[in-house]
């Protein structure tokens, strides 16, 4: 467990480590599981891929698709797709290969909670 915790910390703070994990499907699932276990509240655990966006710095710029970085736009195991700097909260969307569809993260702002469930709804947020 200590090894997994250390791995999680490294991945959380090191984009290079994250890109490395993206190349391994088992590591992608492990990363999502650890993120879910340590940082997701009960309501968020209803989704397979969740993250507490409150912990993400709002000044982050568009990172684009990790799939593009890896040269695998549509087939990468793990993609970091979008963000929102207009209204401050940063929205991270994860796509894991073999999911039947892209599942979007439920994130909470001060005004309301939002769930995106398909790509069309997310289009304004995607960074290409």
Swiss-Prot record:
Listed A to Z, the keywords are: Membrane, Transmembrane, Transmembrane helix
Which coarse location class applies to the principal site listed for this UniProt protein? membrane
The way this protein sits in the membrane is described as: Multi-pass membrane protein
> Can the keyword Transmembrane be found in this entry's annotation?
yes
Is Protein transport found in the keyword set? no
Q: What does the UniProt entry say about where the protein is found?
A: Membrane
Which chain regions cross the lipid bilayer?
1-21, 51-71, 76-96
Pull one GO CC term from this UniProt entry: membrane
UniProt miscellaneous comment: Partially overlaps YML089C.
* Protein name from the UniProt record: Putative uncharacterized protein YML090W
């Amino acid at each position: 467990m200590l090894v997994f915790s250390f791995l999680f910390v490294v991945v959380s703070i090191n984009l290079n480590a994250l890109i490395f994990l993206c190349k391994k499907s088992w590591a992608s699932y492990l990363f999502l599981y650890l993120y879910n276990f340590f940082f997701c509240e009960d309501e968020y655990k209803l989704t397979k891929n969740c993250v507490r966006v409150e912990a993400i710095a709002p000044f982050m710029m568009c990172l684009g698709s990790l799939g593009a970085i890896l040269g695998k736009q549509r087939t990468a195991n793990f993609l970091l797709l979008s963000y929102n700097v207009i209204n401050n909260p940063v929205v991270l969307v994860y796509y894991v290969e073999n999911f039947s569809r892209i599942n979007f993260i439920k994130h909470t702002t001060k005004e309301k909670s939002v769930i995106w469930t398909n790509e069309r709804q997310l289009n304004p947020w995607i960074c290409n």
